[in-house]
Amino acid sequence: MTDLSTLFHAAILGVVEGLTEFLPVSSTGHMIIVGHMLGFTGDKAETFEVIIQLGSILAVVVVFWRRLFGLIGIHFGEVPHEGKTNGKLKLSHIILAMLPAVTLGLMFHDVIKSLFNPQSVMYALVIGGVLLITAEILKPKTPKAEGLDDITYRQAFMIGCFQCLALWPGFSRSGATISGGMLMGVNRYTASEFSFILAVPMMMGASGLDLYKSLHFLSASDIPMFAVGFVTAFVVALVAIKTFLALIKRISFIPFAIYRFIVAAAVYWVFM
């Protein structure tokens, strides 16, 4: 039987996952710190993180379901905040953006796994923050892509190349792809939307594979803990995504970069 303290810890981790998964601040860095503080580590903790990531992914599907169906040619009227779309953003754009990270991820899987340690994550947090600042400084004054349907195949592929940086734990997948999009001439809001949509197949594939490998760690007694974490991550991620998209219309990514430096300092203080 799962005790209340375990469920409370599951809810806390669900909140952390939901808040940080799609913000350019690195969910990995936060989960390492909070998991350490709660004493929740090991194989079961890793399996739990996979489960709650699926909750975050579901939140993206709920927010962008019209766009996701539109990728395969099924349209349900106007997309909120965009109006009528011309359907130029297709599944082929997403597949092209996925290829670099999928290829490198399969080739260097063991190397990437070895990077899941506090010191490596700390460095990734700092360098990812520098990239966010660089993107804000060097982005074109006049964006070439103002909406998702303006994104070219070249831009999609280059964003996918930047996504390879996120194979380094702590770098932040959204931070890498959004920065890459901005440097390629995609405006901040659209780069964020593309990053979220790209996250669905990427994270579902990675999480699905990790879950399959971790099935032997699951037991019926863990269902309440997993359920609480999953639902909490879903609800919090839903709010976080909508709030983030509204916020970045008014502010730059500099505050997120500064926050990353603070988290890196926290990792150093806790683990070094």
From Swiss-Prot:
GO BP: cell wall organization; peptidoglycan biosynthetic process; regulation of cell shape; response to antibiotic
Q: Which reaction does it catalyse?
A: di-trans,octa-cis-undecaprenyl diphosphate + H2O = di-trans,octa-cis-undecaprenyl phosphate + phosphate + H(+)
Membrane topology (UniProt): Multi-pass membrane protein
Q: What class of enzyme is it?
A: hydrolase
UniProt xrefs under InterPro entries: UppP
In the record, the note on similarity to other proteins reads: Belongs to the UppP family.
Q: What does this protein do?
A: Catalyzes the dephosphorylation of undecaprenyl diphosphate (UPP). Confers resistance to bacitracin.
- Its name, as the record gives it, is Undecaprenyl-diphosphatase
